[in-house]
Curated annotation (Swiss-Prot):
Keyword Hydrolase in annotation: yes
Organism: Canis lupus familiaris (Dog)
Single annotated GO MF: alpha-L-fucosidase activity
Reaction(s) this enzyme catalyzes, per UniProt: an alpha-L-fucoside + H2O = L-fucose + an alcohol; a neolactoside IV(2)-alpha-Fuc-nLc4Cer(d18:1(4E)) + H2O = a neolactoside nLc4Cer(d18:1(4E)) + L-fucose; a neolactoside IV(2)-alpha-Fuc-nLc4Cer(d18:0) + H2O = a neolactoside nLc4Cer(d18:0) + L-fucose
Any Pfam family the entry gives: Fucosidase_C
GO CC, any one term: lysosome
PROSITE patterns: ALPHA_L_FUCOSIDASE
Family, as annotated: Belongs to the glycosyl hydrolase 29 family.
Name of the protein in its database record: Tissue alpha-L-fucosidase
GO biological process, one term: fucose metabolic process
Glycosylated residues (UniProt): 241, 268, 382
Length: 465
């Protein structure tokens, strides 16, 4: 006899078989061990890219190191001077420094005296950056953190006597900005690197004593959201032990679930292997790539590091920067914009102005940028000035030139009975009509002083196909 038949209560409700099956499947998934990646590109390249990176869209790159002391030519100063012996660099040194002055003598002058990480982080936040990438070590080998394998050539032993990497990371994370660490695999003049080079990179003295210990240290110490590798081009990934490091990073590191890496892990890797593609500096594809990519570029068109001989014609304009940002995001990329601080840790006003202008633009148009996806059409037909993005069922048309007649003509969107059209930064709906030449949008009659932004306006279209 059933318990409820003798007055012990009603029968329990029947549990649907489907619910039991779903519960069982969930328990199996929960019990299943996480996928592990083997140290080969087929396995590593199959790892899904963490969502945060594609949603971020815009980041700030910071090139900062010993090269900010001479601050002349570019961040490749040491190589141009001693590696290539370029006459203009030799002349610069002879005119400005005493005989026998070495590159290491710049060390004490790299003071970072006015470096206030919270000030930097506030600026980057105001710029609308969702991630920031700092050079932990450029090709010169000087590390911006107390690396135990860079004795007397790091920011704790020489110059600032501070952990620059750690300080900036703490400031950024207080503002929920993702933190990326740039790291150069090679060092131009390190004795062990030169020894491996002499041996045609058949030995790995430098990799085992310097490169790999530093990468593991950076990950365990700072838990970065992104590792921006560089300096790979002389050697294959097998010399750098890249796949071994990345398999550890994806399987066992403290950042295994959210870390993102680029594609510079060996001379055979760029644009072929990695978490996302940089390909080369200032890479700009002509059509929508199959995989996630990032355009890295610099406000100073000539140099990544700060240089005192920069002139205004070398500086990217606000219009140029916004245009590149829009085109990059429309084609599915992220836009990483570089600035170079001074040896004192200051970000010069022209760089601040450019960053703040982007932040102002994004405060109005960010809806069309952050977390967007490429639409079925990226560039409006027969034009170079209208680019599309999308979020769900909403389409955004960003136009870079205001039509003289005040009417924007679009051929790609197909209207429906539910179509609504607005401009970001303007509260009311816009008038529109469909004509044989396409969708005609009648832009608001506003002065330059009442427009939401001065350049790059966004039309929001809902209910279109």
């Amino acid at each position: 006899m059933k318990p409820w038949a003798v007055g012990l209560g009603p029968p329990p409700p029947a549990v649907p078989l489907l619910l039991l099956l779903l519960l069982g499947a969930a328990l199996v998934r929960a019990a299943a061990p996480p996928r592990r990646y083997t140290p080969d590109w087929q396995s590593l390249d199959s790892r899904p890219l963490p969502d945060w990176f594609d949603k971020a869209k815009f980041g700030v790159f910071v090139h900062w190191g010993e090269f900010a002391v001479p601050a002349w030519g570019s961040e490749w100063f040491w190589w141009h001077w001693k590696g290539e012996g370029l006459p203009q660099y030799e002349q610069f040194m002879s005119e400005n420094y005493p005989p026998g002055f070495s590159y290491a003598d710049f060390g004490p002058q790299f003071t970072a005296r006015f470096f206030h990480p919270d000030t930097w982080a506030d600026l980057f936040q105001a710029a609308g950056a969702r991630y920031v990438v700092l050079t932990t070590k450029h090709h010169e080998g000087f590390t911006n953190w107390p690396s135990s394998v860079s004795w007397n050539w790091n920011s704790n032993d020489v110059g600032p006597h501070r952990d620059l990497v750690g300080e900036l990371g703490r400031a950024l994370r207080k503002r929920n900005i993702r933190y990326g660490l740039y790291h150069s695999l090679l060092e131009w003049f390190h004795p062990l690197y030169l020894l491996d080079k002499k041996n045609n990179f058949k030995t790995q003295f430098f990799v085992r004593a310097k490169t790999m210990p530093e990468l593991y240290d950076l990950v365990n110490r700072y838990e970065p959201d992104l590792i921006w590798s560089d300096g790979e081009w002389k050697c294959p990934d097998t010399y750098w032990n890249s796949t071994e490091f990345l398999s550890w990073l994806y399987n066992d590191s403290p950042v295994k679930d959210h870390v993102v890496v680029n594609d510079r892990w060996g001379q055979n890797c760029s644009c072929h292997h990695g978490g996302y593609y940089n390909c080369q500096d200032k890479y700009k594809p002509e059509s929508l790539p199959d995989l996630k990519w990032e355009m890295c570029t610099s406000i100073d068109k000539v140099s990544w590091g700060y240089r005192r001989n920069m002139v205004m014609s070398d500086v990217a304009s606000e219009c140029e920067i916004i245009s590149e940002l829009v085109q990059t995001v429309s084609l599915g990329g992220n836009y990483l914009l570089n600035i170079g601080p001074t040896k004192d840790g200051l970000i010069v006003p022209i760089f601040q102005e450019r960053l703040l202008s982007i932040g102002k633009w994004l405060s109005i148009n960010g809806e069309a940028i952050y977390a967007s996806k490429p639409w079925r059409v990226q560039l409006e037909k027969n034009t170079t000035s209208v680019w599309y993005t999308s979020r769900g069922m909403t389409v955004y048309a960003i136009f870079l030139r205001w039509p003289e007649n005040g009417v924007l003509s679009l051929k790609s969107p197909v209207t429906t009975s539910t179509t609504q059209i607005t401009m970001l930064g303007i509260q009311k709906d816009l008038k529109w009509s469909t004509e044989p030449e396409g969708l005609l949008i009648y832009l608001p009659q506003l002065s330059l002083f009442t427009l939401p932004v001065e350049f790059g306006w966004t039309i929001k279209l809902t209910g279109v196909e």
